[in-house]
Amino acid sequence: MDKTHSSQGKCPVMHGGNTSVTTNNMDWWPKALNLDILHQHDKKTDPMDPTFNYSEAFKTLDLAAVKQDLYALMTDSQDWWPADWGHYGGLMIRMAWHSAGTYRIADGRGGAGTGNQRFAPLNSWPDNANLDKARRLLWPIKKKYGNKLSWADLIILAGNVAYESMGLKTYGFAGGRADIWHPEKDIYWGSEKQWLAPSDNPNSRYSGERDLENPLAAVMMGLIYVNPEGVDGNPDPLRTAQDIRITFARMAMDDEETVALTAGGHTVGKCHGNGKAQNLGPEPEAEDVEAQGLGWLNKHGRGVGRNTVTSGIEGAWTTHPTQWDNGYFSLLLGYDWELKKSPAGAWQWEPINIKEEDKPVDVEDPTIRHNPIMTDADMAMKMDPEYRKISEKFYKDPAYFSEVFARAWFKLTHRDLGPKSRYLGPEVPAEDLIWQDPIPQVDYRLSDDDITALKAKILASGLSIAELVTTAWDSARTFRGSDYRGGANGARIRLAPQKDWEGNEPVRLQKVLKVLTDIQTGLSQKVSIADLIVLGGTAAVEKAAQDAGVNIRVPFASGRGDASQEMTDIESFAVLEPLHDAYRNWQKKDYVVQPEELMLDRTQLMGLTAHEMTVLIGGMRVLGANYAGSAHGVFTDRVGVLSNDFFVNLTDMSYNWKPAGNNLYQIIERKTGTVKWTATRVDLVFGSNSVLRSYAEIYAQDDAKEKFVHDFVNAWTKVMNADRFDLA
């Protein structure tokens, strides 16, 4: 038979290259370290030119022109997705809300800062149903302004303009959110294997009475906040209130902000459930190519307009859903409500004996009126005693409600943008807000001669290399690239709560701070404690490198300010407390998660790569920077010298490695049986993991002594400057 003919009908692609069917390493070894979380959003996935800087591009944007286009869009109803009552405001607000609403304060991940709603899993979450249509409506505007306006900024701006177009005076808007180009790999959304799995299912995010797993804020896989029908879909406003309080607290919101956001979000727009959920097609990620990235395509009637199905709940909350007013509280508090089922079979609350004029009109026919609705979450604003007090206050004082909501909305949509120094645009509010972690600007810059003299003073102060290195590290390590909080700028390590954190070794910390403060007091020129802390670490690293035979100047840029206690929200900063730090070979207690996995999580938050993590661990060990001076992992006889000894001895087959207790190992000389060193899992993983060992071998080579020092200095400087947005 002809060979060409016999091959017809076979797959033209070798299955080894078919990513949809191949078995990858994590399938074979699911407990292996997932180093991929350290290698995201690099130039290989970024289509922009290497010199492109989004912040600089945004500065050239005509924001007023963009807003005018958005105002026009709000009432330019499209046949393929008609606007309710001829106004897209409610849809745009929901899109912006759900973009920002994934933020959680525990690890700073989620939120609106990256435009991640465009990608899986968020683009296909049940709670984000039909937001694909909102983004498609925005496409002409994104297309028009191009690279000057990111999707991340446009999504939030559209929500702001939607409110303004309906009568709310917003608090402000800041740009500066750069887009990502593929789904995030580091965010833990929960371990459930099905959408909207109830809390009694396997892999539940709940334990005990109803303890929500940290760092999660949403109550179900695929939801942004709480279940609108009630806990696990069972209506009970008081139980729902408990969920709301926990969820919003984990988003850094207090009770007043929670009521304001709930009411303000439901003052406009409507829920959609006028049909059966089974008429909806699959979510975007599961749809076929002809859907072109859209999902939830509705086969019921026209499938749009009054036939739209989204959450399954059907109706508007207020009489005038395209106007900013106090109608939410008028209806919620002015009527008694009873449970009903929507046409889609969802639980919702409807008013008893409502006046005809209080009913909102149909989205297409103004001669028809329908009952307003409330979700179980809305009823919690009435039934929970604390929420009720706030609701009544807002009802009696609409102006106060509008102000509180505008501020809470700004906080919701800007919380993960970081400090005010990252804000861009003409609508940035002048006021400094405590949740922005304000830091005073400095009015000095140290010259090279000043820096050299200060380093000499610090090294002559009697403080050890380890003391200087650990203090600088502890000050800087709180930075997290998820929401741009923490870092050495502000020197908050000298303030509550950081000065008392166990991981900061308060006694050692106060000793170092006193010496640095005395140096500061004796100077004729201005210099902040924040700068002195980092400069102390810089001087120590230079000295340790010199002692290793490598002369190198560690980069240092002055300009850090010193925050005050009044500028510091103690409760808000509590979430930044390190409970583990592999770089200092310490964790507060044993956790379910292995120490090396905790190391990866912390490393990712700090914005470091796998090889930067590797070189920093090796350097910190030989510098003697372990917590409380522990000897674990200090594979050197020259402590305080920036040598590659950690890697040389880790990869030396003259030694054998044996467990000696919980997270403790002994390094034994094979010939003599003598215990040479001790180590933890985060030390040995650099020899056991094949990828990390490949990096360790690079630094263990005979020709790597200078490369090791240079790479350590580069990674060290990156950590010290992680929060120096003024240097970017």
UniProtKB/Swiss-Prot annotation:
InterPro entries associated with the record: Catalase_peroxidase (IPR000763), Haem_peroxidase (IPR002016), Haem_peroxidase_sf (IPR010255), Peroxidases_AS (IPR019794)
A single BP term in Gene Ontology: hydrogen peroxide catabolic process
GO molecular function per UniProt: catalase activity; heme binding; metal ion binding
Cofactor needs: heme b
Active site, renumbered: 98
The keyword Oxidoreductase belongs to this UniProt entry's keyword annotation: yes
Family annotation (Gene3D superfamilies): 1.10.520.10, Peroxidase, domain 2 (1.10.420.10)
PANTHER family in alphabetical order: CATALASE-PEROXIDASE, HYDROPEROXIDASE I, BIFUNCTIONAL CATALASE-PEROXIDASE
Name of the protein in its database record: Catalase-peroxidase
